[in-house]
Amino acid sequence: MALAINVSSSSSSAISSSSFPSSDLKVTKIGSLRLLNRTNVSAASLSLSGKRSSVKALNVQSITKESIVASEVTEKLDVVEVEDFEELAKRLENASPLEIMDKALEKFGNDIAIAFSGAEDVALIEYAHLTGRPYRVFSLDTGRLNPETYRLFDTVEKHYGIRIEYMFPDAVEVQALVRNKGLFSFYEDGHQECCRIRKVRPLRRALKGLRAWITGQRKDQSPGTRSEIPVVQVDPVFEGLDGGVGSLVKWNPVANVEGNDVWNFLRTMDVPVNTLHAAGYVSIGCEPCTRAVLPGQHEREGRWWWEDAKAKECGLHKGNIKENTNGNATANVNGTASVADIFNSENVVNLSRQGIENLMKLENRKEAWIVVLYAPWCPFCQAMEASFDELADKLGGSGVKVAKFRADGDQKDFAKKELQLGSFPTILVFPKNSSRPIKYPSEKRDVDSLTSFLNLVR
């Protein structure tokens, strides 16, 4: 999209807070945006701060025929810089999220904002903070968010010293929906109508005041629908401040980052996160439409789980927790019920208390180790047994040892104090050249996810 802006040199009064009529904008190509080359405009025409963060929208209050003629016969000032965001996306494809964030804030200043949902996209705010540039953050308050999400909003504001710009749904539209269909109509006829009122329309209003926005979309969040996300693009759906298709640029700094790496970054930087993550929530939205996922499930399976039942039946029902025939709900009051052991592959080393203590003391190991802290009665441990045994068989003879340590009963206090045990199962990686184990941060415990994390830290 190309935006051609003609500015008269006769007076600076043509710059005001009113918007360009959409008819004054000439469309060329989606994928590129023509920005005014401010360095070629005289100071008499524009009064701009040297800081990009203070640059406001260039808008015309009134353009007379005389001023247009005058500008054409004197100095030509409609010099434009063509920004090809498709080409920029290619150049930034292998850039770090920090570099991409810095480029976005540098280019758009106060006309760009971070969209924050209250989940792991808090990483975007940390990256923006690390650039040292001013930045804006907005969030959609649907009125149906979890209390934990609202508390995170408050914590983030205090942690970074910012004010989140909240967008709310239209009260009349919400009232009509609830009165006509009730509070939970989405369980009956799908979530699209409710989301359109509570999320999409407020987002449109927010974006109409911007020229660019920053999202936390990642390719691995939904391989079927998000696998082609570029790090920057001209938004093909929403409109920006100047109006019209192509008037808004969308930045996705973490598009190429794996979820595990995002979490490692959050932990390393000690960033405040939503406490729902510790309860098994990965993708977090409105309270009625979000639930925790089970080990091995994809993170998006915790959202709108009642829809497209046939298409998602295998993934959903496979993770369902069934009543344990060993009676673990009543028999293991002290966490030491007599139930069959798990993780029984011949390639899984069974560590004793002394064995894992010795492993912790080693500073220069010959091999890396991946160890699961488990309780055999725990349904989440049982659910990951097959994938962990498969991992052990896959890594046999590879230079990585796979082990288990039963951490319930008398060993639980030790495991909490010395082994970072929070809940079962907890997975630790003991790198070759480090005595301190690294805790696996994700609820995704399939073979590929575990292998990917292991390769990053071993």
From Swiss-Prot:
Tissue: Leaves, roots and stem.
InterPro entries for the chain: PAPS/APS_Rdtase, PAPS_reduct_dom, Rossmann-like_a/b/a_fold, Thioredoxin-indep_APS_Rdtase, Thioredoxin-like_sf, Thioredoxin_domain
Activity regulation information from UniProt: Stimulated by sodium sulfate > ammonium sulfate.
Disulfides per UniProt: 378-381
Catalytically driven reaction(s): glutathione disulfide + sulfite + AMP + 2 H(+) = adenosine 5'-phosphosulfate + 2 glutathione
Domain Thioredoxin span(s) in chain numbering: 337-458
Transit peptide as recorded in UniProt: 1-69
Statement: the UniProt record of this protein carries the keyword Chloroplast: yes
GO BP terms: cysteine biosynthetic process; sulfate assimilation; sulfate assimilation, phosphoadenylyl sulfate reduction by phosphoadenylyl-sulfate reductase (thioredoxin)
Induction: By sulfate starvation.
Chief site of localization: plastid
Keywords from the named record: 4Fe-4S, Amino-acid biosynthesis, Chloroplast, Cysteine biosynthesis, Disulfide bond, Iron, Iron-sulfur, Metal-binding, Oxidoreductase, Plastid, Redox-active center, Stress response, Transit peptide
Domain remark from Swiss-Prot or TrEMBL: The C-terminal domain may function as glutaredoxin and mediates the interaction of the enzyme with glutathione (GSH). Active in GSH-dependent reduction of hydroxyethyldisulfide, cystine, dehydroascorbate, insulin disulfides and ribonucleotide reductase.
Family label: Belongs to the APS reductase family.
Function (record text): Reduces sulfate for Cys biosynthesis. Substrate preference is adenosine-5'-phosphosulfate (APS) >> 3'-phosphoadenosine-5'-phosphosulfate (PAPS). Uses glutathione or DTT as source of protons.
Name listed for the protein in its UniProt record: 5'-adenylylsulfate reductase 3, chloroplastic
Species classification: Eukaryota, Viridiplantae, Streptophyta, Embryophyta, Tracheophyta
Name of the encoding gene: APR3
